C-alpha cells in the first residue's frame, strides 16, 4: 500500500510538473515564434519596457528647434534706405557759388569816384532845390508872409479858402524835401520874403509900406512865380541891416511851418544863416 501511495504521489507530481512546464510555452510562442529560448526574452521585454519609460524624459528637448527665430532676421535687409541718398548729388548748388567772386571787382569801382559822385550830387541838389524855391516853396513863402501880415496888423490878408489852399500846397512840398535840406529850404523861404519886402519898398518909397497881396496864382497845384525871375538880387547873402528882419521872419517860419505840416526841422536851423540860393548838407 505504501508503494501504491508513493507511485500515486509521483504520478500526481509528474502531471503537475508537466502541466506547469507546458503552460508558459504557448504564451511565449505567439510573441516571438522564431526564437527557441522564450525564457530569456521575458527579461528583455521587461528591460525594453523600462527603457522607454526612462527615455520619455528626452521629448522636452524638442522645443529647441521651435526656438529658431532666424526668419525674423530677414527684415534687417529690408530697411536699407540707400536709394534715398541718390538725391544728394542732385541738390549740389555749387554753381551759385560762382557769382561771389564776381562782385569783388565791383567794390573798388565805387570807392574811386566818391568825390566826383559827391560833387555831382551836390550840384543836383542845388539845381533841384533852386527849382523847388522858384516854384514849389512859393506857397510856404505866402503862408509865412500871411502870418507876418497878421502879426503886423496889415490890411492885406488873404481869404480863408485861398489860405487853406496855400497850406496844403506848402505841406505837400515840404514832405518832398529831404530832412537834411529842410533847414536850407526854410532859409530860402525867409530870403524870398525879405526880397518880396524889398521889392515893395522899391515900388513904394514912402515910409509907410503897405503889403500887397501876392500876384501868384495856384491853378491845380501848378505854381508860377515871376518876381524871383525879374529880381536881379535873387542870389546873395543877408545884409547886416537885414539881419533883424531875417531873424524875425525865420522865427516866425520855424514856428508856423513845422507845426502846420507836422514835419521835422533840424534844431540848428534857428541859429545858422544860409546864403540865399546855396544849398548843402550840414
Swiss-Prot record:
Residues 1-20 form the signal peptide. Residues 224-240 have a biased composition (Polar residues). It comes from the Eukaryota. It holds the Pfam family Gliadin. Keywords: Allergen, Repeat, Seed storage protein, Signal, Storage protein. The keyword Nucleotide-binding does not apply. Residues 27-59, 112-122 have a biased composition (Low complexity). GO terms for molecular function: nutrient reservoir activity. Gliadin is the major seed storage protein in wheat. Belongs to the gliadin/glutenin family. The alpha/beta-gliadins can be divided into 5 homology classes. Sequence divergence between the classes is due to single base substitutions and to duplications or deletions within or near direct repeats. There are more than a 100 copies of the gene for alpha/beta-gliadin per haploid genome. This is Alpha/beta-gliadin A-III.
